[in-house]
């Protein structure tokens, strides 16, 4: 018999009957996951996560690119049928999620990228500008994994379409 001391603490994962190799799994590191909402943990789901009770609303867009973002929400357009322009996007919007009205053009979106705005929510966007933003033509696809500084959520569709009154008022 030979006694060996493991250089690490852990749990024996497996022992090979052929080679005698012992695989030891180190203690798992806890993973912290942001909830993106404030609230109260009402249930713990073993090995999966938690349920958070919160006063919240769910706004679903028609289309989005850039994944999840967080920041203070600021209404920038004066109405739900106003276009979000370059002039509307200020340095003070850096790190924020801004809400426009009916549309954001490619130049205004580039301004938001340049200023590191975290997200833009508008009624519409030009489909043909997506290729310039992404660097490739987007077909039918699951979106949200694009590596973009500024996420874009389009609530109504392609083109200049005023944001629904209900959505705009909720965000306002």
PLM region spans:
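Well-ordered secondary-structure scaffolds
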Residues: 1-172
């Amino acid at each position: 018999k030979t006694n060996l001391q493991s250089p690490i603490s852990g749990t024996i994962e497996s022992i090979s009957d052929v080679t005698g190799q012992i695989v030891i799994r180190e203690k798992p590191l806890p993973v912290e996951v942001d909830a993106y909402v404030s609230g109260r943990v009402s249930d713990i789901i073993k090995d999966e996560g938690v349920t958070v009770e919160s006063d919240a609303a769910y706004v679903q867009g028609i289309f989005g690119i850039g994944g999840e973002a967080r920041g203070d929400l600021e209404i920038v357009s004066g109405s739900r049928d106003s276009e979000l322009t370059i002039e509307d996007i200020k340095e003070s919007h850096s790190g924020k999620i801004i809400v426009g009205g009916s549309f954001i053009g490619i130049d205004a979106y580039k301004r938001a990228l340049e200023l590191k705005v975290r997200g833009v929510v508008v009624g519409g966007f030009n489909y043909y500008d997506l290729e310039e933003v992404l660097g490739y033509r987007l077909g039918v696809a699951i979106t949200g994994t694009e590596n973009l500084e500024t996420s874009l959520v389009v609530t109504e569709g392609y083109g200049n379409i005023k944001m629904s009154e209900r959505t705009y008022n909720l965000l306002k």
